[in-house]
A protein has these predicted regions:
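Noncatalytic linker/hinge segments flanking ATPase motor cores
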Residues: 4, 14-15, 47
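Conserved GNAT-fold acetyl-CoA-binding loop/helix
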Residues: 1-8
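A short, surface-exposed loop/turn module that caps and links secondary-structure elements
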Residues: 14-41
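A general, composition-driven signal for non-globular sequence regions
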Residues: 6, 31, 40, 59-60
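Enriched for short, Lys/Arg-rich terminal
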Residues: 41-75
Length: 75
């Protein structure tokens, strides 16, 4: 499972290079000054990232089975 998750993570991260706005705006983080986006990796995980000029900053790989309030505190 770890190898599959890693490969999915790399595939999605590479896709962000071509299409940085492919992820949805992250509802849980709308109150922040930055526009956090998320991109689903698999059925349990997603990348949470921001676009800063030409850079894509991945803030966390989030396990969606966790309490959503933890995401607000973590990022």
């Amino acid at each position: 499972y770890a190898v599959k998750l890693y490969n999915s993570f790399i595939d999605k991260a590479e896709r962000l290079l071509s299409f940085p706005q492919i992820g949805h705006l992250e509802n849980l983080l709308q109150h922040r000054n930055e526009n956090f986006r998320s991109l689903v990796i698999d059925e349990h995980n997603k990348l949470v990232y921001t676009i800063e000029g030409e850079d894509i900053v991945i803030h966390t790989v989030w396990d969606c089975r966790q309490n959503p309030k933890k995401l607000i505190k973590k990022v």
